[in-house]
Amino acid sequence: MRHRKSGRQLNRNSSHRQAMFRNMAGSLVRHEIIKTTLPKAKELRRVVEPLITLAKTDSVANRRLAFARTRDNEIVAKLFNELGPRFASRAGGYTRILKCGFRAGDNAPMAYIELVDRPEAQAEAVAE
């Protein structure tokens, strides 16, 4: 029985899941919007939101924790230099999930996951 087991398996083993969400979190931080399946978007929210909360307090220890979770210095720099200050006054809820139909081929439910309060110029050019 799977009672009280949180998180989705997504038909992957744990190392594949960890690598996938590490890559997806980096893409979301870099582009501020990505298109993926709805279950992956819902699970990605559980990875990205704590990273942004961590970035609100700039310290060497927090930067090392963020690097341990993302393994990308460019992502860590953007988190602490741009996103942390941008969301300093927001107490959680940094992402938004927008459903966008179904994928051709397997009819999987698709969704955009984006960071709220994106700059307007970037909001118009939707990256997929």
Curated annotation (Swiss-Prot):
GO terms for molecular function: structural constituent of ribosome. It comes from the Bacteria. GO terms for biological process: translation. Gene3D superfamilies: Ribosomal protein L17 (3.90.1030.10). Signal peptide: none annotated. SUPFAM superfamilies: Prokaryotic ribosomal protein L17. GO terms for cellular component: cytosolic large ribosomal subunit. Keywords: Ribonucleoprotein, Ribosomal protein. InterPro entries: Ribosomal_bL17, Ribosomal_bL17_CS, Ribosomal_bL17_sf. Belongs to the bacterial ribosomal protein bL17 family. Part of the 50S ribosomal subunit. Contacts protein L32. PANTHER family: LARGE RIBOSOMAL SUBUNIT PROTEIN BL17M (PTHR14413:SF16), RIBOSOMAL PROTEIN L17 (PTHR14413). This is Large ribosomal subunit protein bL17. It comes from Erwinia tasmaniensis (strain DSM 17950 / CFBP 7177 / CIP 109463 / NCPPB 4357 / Et1/99).
